Amino acid sequence: MSDAYRTETRESGTMSFRIEWVYDHDCDPPWDREDGHGPVSDWEHRSKRPGEMILDSNRGSHRFYDFAQAVKTARVEGWNTAPFDWPTNGARAHAAALADFKYLQAWCNDQWHYCGIVVTLLDADGEPESVDASLWGIESEGDDYHEEVIEELIFECMHEITATIGV
């Protein structure tokens, strides 16, 4: 695949599989696809208002994170973040909103992205077979979760093989 940024081959029993991590360009920004984030504006050409933080900038336009509203939401919804033992609800909400801002800012700064993991069965010559499985919309920074996904996708491929040959 042309957008694969990492590829490796793994063995499972007598079978070989190619594992590809592929940029998922079809994912919406995290604040549009997931709950639990503070309000983020569209691109706007204006100055920051009180209670806002600049999340991202490009050619004089900005996306603003409504930090004041995020803290209010965090308090009501019980958001939390490490170290998880904040002395007050206000401190917890403030820290959680700040962690949310940093998480979203990291996405804006390409410090993480969404990806797809594609597992493809390889023949004895290392060429791809028609059996594959994939999962998309995964955060790029989740190696433990990636391993779980890879194991499940290999299992899915093996299940497809056994279903095809009737074993």
Residue ranges and their predicted role:
Residues 1-167:
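Acidic interaction surfaces
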